[in-house]
A protein has these predicted regions:
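Alpha-helical cap/lid subdomain in secreted, periplasmic
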Residues: 36-168, 172-185
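Structural motif
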Residues: 25-34
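Ser/Thr-centric signal marking residues that sit
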Residues: 1, 28, 106
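Residues at alpha-helix caps and immediate loop-helix transition turns in enzyme cores, especially N-
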Residues: 6, 31-32, 170
Length: 185
């Protein structure tokens, strides 16, 4: 079967019009500096799924040899996440300027266990994702915006094409949740 992207799945299962402004590899910096300008007043819904690449760009944090107390390590993690969290909230704040109803998506955990590149940090990466997702929930609550929990959608290895990217099946599940959300709005 052909491997469809989330956008292709959306177009296949819904008669609504969809525009993807996300770029592969984009971070919260990219979204703030160049992607939000593509949101228009005609849009009725926006889906924000960003932050995973920011975490991926900081994955080396998990391989550091810390000789600190757990408190100090957690403080280091908080400091590392701070600019990402600030960017994320700035994006959400800008999205509230548009008439489109936003949906925030948590960062999924990836299929890291057993992968050559990420197996040794799979569990700590899951914790790092949880710390960031906590910020997404907090920001969603602050701005009264619904949050879609991607960790409940991407649950098996079949949902991933590789340790990081969703597969055809995972993308289809994500698209179905987006359509369900749009239809229930």
């Amino acid at each position: 079967t052909d491997e469809l992207s989330v956008l292709e799945h959306l177009k296949h299962i819904s008669n609504d019009e969809f525009l993807q402004i996300a770029l592969d590899g984009a971070t919260t910096d990219h979204v703030l500096s160049s992607q939000l300008e593509h949101v228009s007043e005609e849009d009725t819904h926006t889906v924000l799924s960003v932050g995973g690449n920011d975490l991926l760009n900081n994955i080396s944090f998990l391989t550091q040899d810390f000789r600190y107390s757990p408190n100090r390590v957690l403080e280091q993690l908080r400091q590392m996440l701070l600019p990402i969290n600030k960017n994320y909230e700035a994006i959400v704040q800008k999205l509230t300027d548009y008439r489109a109803t936003p949906l925030l998506c948590t960062v999924y955990e990836g299929d890291l266990v057993g992968s050559e590149e990420f197996d040794s940090i799979a569990e700590s990466a899951r914790s790092m994702v949880s710390f960031f997702n906590d910020s997404i929930y907090r920001i969603g609550s602050k701005y009264n915006i619904e949050v879609l929990e991607l960790r409940e959608i991407f649950v098996t290895s079949e949902d991933y094409a590789n340790p990081i990217e969703p597969s055809h099946k995972g993308g289809q599940k994500f698209a179905k949740e987006i359509v369900r959300w749009v239809d229930n709005e």
